[in-house]
């Protein structure tokens, strides 16, 4: 007998059988952005910079002096359970999608770029366009991926481009990621 599908997940009919969450972490609404997590951290915070990043050791000016994990020290390239925000916040069985998971989604689903215009809450005479992706699986079921943009100084154009994290460390052809690289995300350009 097949296991029941958790209420907050959806089976898109992917070849791997992987279930996807119906919403981003930090919200139960599929159209909301949810919370922002630094890669390898399991809680949100008010200040996202080198000196507050748990995987960096910095000097007093915030200059990175050492990468504490996922570096040439340990050669780990995929988030471990204790560093996975989905596992820490949603429980056993949940995890941040890998590059392979995202590729399966890109290869096997129909992607539709949709823009919805909504009134601004404080001034209903003004409107804001909100972009999102409707991702329909082989079985006809779908998930919604809001256009998230990036975070602060890295990239922040949530009206168009979308960046979702992967559990994989970005690898350069000659080794592990550069300590200044923020390429741990799937970039979805508007429209695909």
Region roles according to the model:
Residues 3-52, 57-74, 78-192:
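C-terminal, surface-exposed recognition/capping segments
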């Amino acid at each position: 007998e097949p296991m029941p599908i958790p209420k907050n997940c959806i089976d898109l009919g992917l070849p791997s059988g992987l279930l996807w969450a119906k919403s981003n972490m930090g919200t139960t609404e599929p159209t909301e952005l949810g919370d922002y997590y630094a890669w390898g951290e399991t809680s949100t915070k008010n200040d996202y910079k080198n000196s507050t990043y748990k995987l960096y050791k910095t000097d007093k000016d915030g200059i990175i002096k050492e990468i504490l994990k996922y570096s040439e020290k340990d050669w780990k390239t995929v988030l471990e359970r204790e560093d996975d925000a989905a596992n820490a916040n949603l429980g056993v069985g949940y995890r941040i999608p890998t590059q392979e998971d995202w590729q399966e989604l890109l290869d096997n689903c129909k992607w539709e770029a949709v823009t919805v215009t909504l009134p601004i809450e404080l001034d209903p005479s003004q409107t804001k366009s909100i972009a999102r992706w409707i991702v329909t699986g082989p079985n006809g079921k779908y998930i919604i991926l809001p256009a998230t943009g990036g975070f602060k100084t890295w990239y922040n154009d949530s009206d168009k481009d979308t960046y979702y994290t992967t559990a994989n460390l970005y690898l350069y052809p000659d080794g592990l990621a550069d300590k200044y690289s923020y390429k741990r995300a799937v970039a979805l350009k508007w429209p695909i």
